[in-house]
């Protein structure tokens, strides 16, 4: 499956692992870059999703905000753990793709099709957990990496809320990591980061 959208080219490829008779896995690409790999049952095969899943359980069960829908694996997971989930996604086409190929089964999630920056700016609700998983191709749009953006994100969180952020950093360029961390530190006291060198 391949279809252009206003926000880039979306492509889904199915494959059987190790040329076996196992169930088909599906990969979601945006503008040629992998966004997620999901088994037929909807379980993500990407390491970072499992890290986010485990870390999210440190939060009180309550309201969760997911910025970036992708293949729908994370919203699916959070719903299964009884979170009240709001999802912000700029590209409406991702929902139909996630439903058809990635076993996304919307139950109670509220999905808002708009730019994450705009949503955060006008946000009135307080969230126990916010997950930022925003990519355009192989990078994050610049307006979603600023101190101002994270200041507004913080305003959408309860006092002891948790923010999980998935981002791509070139580990060969120390200054890039320093920039990302200094941006987080401008608004948040306790920061933990994990690397997945396979990505």
PLM regions: where:
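Class I S-adenosylmethionine
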Residues: 1-88, 92-102
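Class I S-adenosyl-L-methionine
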Residues: 2-3, 171, 175-199
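Short beta->alpha hinge that forms the Motif I/post-I loop of the SAM-binding pocket
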Residues: 89-92, 114-116, 145, 176
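Conserved SAM-binding strand-loop segment of SAM-dependent methyltransferases
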Residues: 104-116
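A short acidic, Gly/Pro-enriched loop at the edge of an enzyme's catalytic core
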Residues: 121-131
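Glycine/threonine-rich flexible loop motifs
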Residues: 138-145
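A short glycine-rich, Lys/Arg-flanked "PGG" loop and its adjoining helix->strand segment in the class I
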Residues: 145-159
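Conserved beta-strand signature within the Rossmann-like core of class I S-adenosyl-L-methionine
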Residues: 160-167
